[in-house]
Amino acid sequence: MVEVNDMYYAFSKNEEIAEKGEYGGAVTSLLKFLLEEGMVDAVLAVKKGSDLYDAVPTLITEPEKVIESAGSLHCGTLNIAKVITRYLNGAKDIKIAVTTKPCDAMTIVEVAKRGKIDLDNVIMVGVNCGGTLPPVKTRAMIEEVYEMDPDDVVKEEIAKGKLIIETSDAEKGISVDEVEEMGYGRRTNCRRCEKNIPRMADLALGNWGVIGPLAGKATFVEVTSEKGADLLEKAVSAGVIEIEDPIPKGIEIREKIDQAMVNLAKKWQKNDFNEETGAEILMNLDRYMDELNKCIKCYSCREACPICYCEECSLETKTPEWIEKGKIPPSPLFHLERMLHMVDSCTNCGQCEELCPAEIPLAKIWHEINCRVQETFGYKTGFETGQEPPLTHP
């Protein structure tokens, strides 16, 4: 019997999926099984668009099409939670399975706390994430640093501390630290992220810790909820996937990799954040005013933020008029208002910074303040569905 906190090596019994899906195709097989058994109405996943650097969210209702979403897209920088709230009515009238990076899963949990997603209708199949790559800069990096043609790349991955780029006839790996010191590599928000294994999802899957005969042929699965346990047990009973107990050394290696990534994140936090550990929250906002004064009030940050969902935004209300119309840069109240609305639930997904045309380091600002909020209130963003965000009123 599969139970919460169990760990396994898992691989698909379907040869086509095992070959096309990564590390034995367990993720793809689980998603296909959910649709075939009618446990969900649709699967929300990401598939390759025009090329490797273009990740497109897709809603799949036909089991045979799930395989189109197989494989990783490290240049897929979207936050899938926004799709659920904006286009699927928060899964309030549809049952879905969704593949989630840790920041996706954390955001889904935070938005659910605010009553905008029905978690009873969502199964989160979480995948490990050591960071995503900005598409445009990654193409430039591949050409300038790796001396490869970006259009010839068939795969990219982070393994053993290296960013590895593969074409059909060549492979080259360079230290993650080295490429990031050059200004390339992972997105800046990903560098600071300590959440690599999505234990806030229903299942946490990845290749870390798979050693021995199944190395490269199976996925490491950690069961993180009752829903996840039920799904895995049914899939195994149906003969869709096969599971084996993990090699103890593999469990140890997985934890070491995770801890190494956490240590690297803390190094980047120290590099990016205010060194005054006891600094007041608002002091952090004040010291970024020069950056915030670049704002052209385009509202891209609000539109991109998966935590922003108000039907009537207080930044645009006429009565009272909190923000003076036509003034650029806007009053500091513009950013203070946004901060009060979302910063306690900020998951450092980086959407705001990625879309800002003024190149304001918004993700860094909100992430730093969110860390202060967590320290001050003892809050753990993205976990514990019963714990309300400290700055949010029901």
From Swiss-Prot:
Record carries keyword Iron: yes
- Enumerate the cofactors the protein uses: [4Fe-4S] cluster; FAD; Zn(2+)
The free-text function statement in the UniProt record for this protein reads: Catalyzes the oxidation of formate to carbon dioxide, with coenzyme F420 as the electron acceptor.
EC class: oxidoreductase
What is known about its induction? Transcripts are present at all growth stages in cells growing on formate but are barely detectable during early exponential growth on H(2) plus CO(2).
Taxonomic source organism? Methanothermobacter thermautotrophicus
> Is Oxidoreductase there in the keyword field?
yes
* Official protein name in the record: F420-dependent formate dehydrogenase subunit beta
Q: What is its EC number?
A: 1.17.98.3
Point out the gene that encodes the protein.
Answer: fdhB
